[in-house]
Amino acid sequence: MKIGLEMHFQLPTRSKLFCSCPTTSAEPNHNVCPVCLGYPGSRPSLNRKALETGLGIARFLDCAIEERVWFSRKTYFYPDLPKNFQITQYESPLGTNGHFDLNGRRIGIWRVHLEEDPGRIRRVGRSGEEIAFVDYNRSGIPLVEIVTAPDLTSPEEAREFIDQLVIELRSLCGLEAQDEQSVRVDANISLGEERVEV
């Protein structure tokens, strides 16, 4: 079994990635502005603290730091993404080819990059009769995405890797990994057989 992880961590900044809206919790749709809602003519301004924190994480993971990076728009059509695109560094990461040591084994880090968090959908009601509410307070909060090589060999090892990385990031940059909103992980699992998309 081979497991690679795509981990998204909310960065502990006071404002969002491209605007001055606060990242603290508030009543739904209170911490929003034309920039994080994607209004035409609004002008984003990069959060320096988020960039510095992302670079610090990439350096900590011993990544090769790129001399020039940029952001691009990744198009999605979801109700929790008011702009219908996510601003990301997917094509131009802060760092590549790093590693994290876990129990004497080196786990490869393919990439570290910044991107915006989408909004949050909350469903209320019984199954089949649900009503969906969208809260855009989270939209635009800075995320760092860390993508590992498929070097993990079991679900238990993957969980231990995440736990250890969270401990290190708490110490390094004050990461607050307290709930499912601040840390989200996707696992890519290969059983060594023919590839099947699920």
Task: Give residue ranges: language-model regions.
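Basic, nucleic-acid-interacting segments
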Residues: M1-V198
